[in-house]
Amino acid sequence: MADPTLLILASLALGDKHGYAMMVDIQAFANVELGPGTLYGAITRLEQRGFIRPIAGGDRRRPYHLTAAGKRYLEEELARLESVVRVGLGRLRRA
């Protein structure tokens, strides 16, 4: 169960990337394969929310940049997930 939104934002937290580079990075750090439809659908939604923005470039690959709003959202969601993991692991240990 992997949220493509968080995976894309986490990938861009390390620096600007185009779609294919994001797919490779996400596969490497999360062991999750995002198909092009899933990736580019999520990219469109992230752009609409102002969390990422495309960078003008000369070649046909369009790199994306994590905005300040996207960074804030990623930080908040990762903190929330960290809390969920902590609670979940604690409950498993008691079971």
Predicted features, each with a name:
Residues S11-L14, I55, Y73, E77-R80:
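Histidine kinase transmitter module recognition
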Residues D59-L78:
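Basic, amphipathic "hinge/linker" alpha-helix immediately C-terminal to the N-terminal HTH DNA-binding motif
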Residues E47-G58, H65:
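Beta-hairpin "wing" of winged helix-turn-helix
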Residues M22, G70, L81:
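Conserved anionic group-binding/transfer micro-motifs
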Residues M1-T38, G58:
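N-terminal helix-turn-helix DNA-binding core of bacterial DNA-binding proteins
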Residues E75-A95:
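Amphipathic alpha-helical dimerization/coiled-coil segments
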Residues L39-G41, R45-L46:
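Basic amphipathic alpha-helical segments that dock to polyanions
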